[in-house]
């Protein structure tokens, strides 16, 4: 039994699939594909899967990964990719299937590209220029106004 990493991209309407729904999608796709995946032992067996660094709802991705254990000794990774892409929902495409080289918790960082409106740099500069950013904090004792200015990072916008 080996662990296989399935790398996929999530675009357009698929970006609104939450992590729990994505788990259900992957389970259904793997079941329908007929690929030899390993199931947990127990009263209600399910496919063993691990998602590495899942994204928040509404974010598109070019590289998301799910690790799956397989019962096959030497799986044909090209056949896995073809079988999965044939039944994937619109907006999700598997672009690589390979044996696991490093565990999901070994990922140290991720690179994000975020697109903002044209006036975002100006609004961010205005925000950074503020001396204080009052925030209402609710507690058992009531509502009080605090400033977390000393905790915020200095944000910048860069043109790429």
Predicted regions located by residue number:
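Short, extreme N-terminal leader segments that mark the start of a protein/domain
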Residues: 1-28, 32-35
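Short glycine-/aliphatic-rich beta-strand segments at the starts of folded cytosolic domains
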Residues: 6-8, 110-115
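Short, intrinsically disordered, mixed-charge
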Residues: 22-36, 82-90, 129-132
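Short, charge-patterned binding micro-sites
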Residues: 38-68
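Ordered, amphipathic secondary-structure segments that act as subunit-interaction surfaces
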Residues: 62-113
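A contiguous pocket-lining binding segment that forms or flanks enzyme active sites
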Residues: 115-117, 125-138
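Long, contiguous binding/interaction regions
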Residues: 137-147
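Conserved small/polar residues in nucleotide/adenosyl-binding loops
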Residues: 149-156
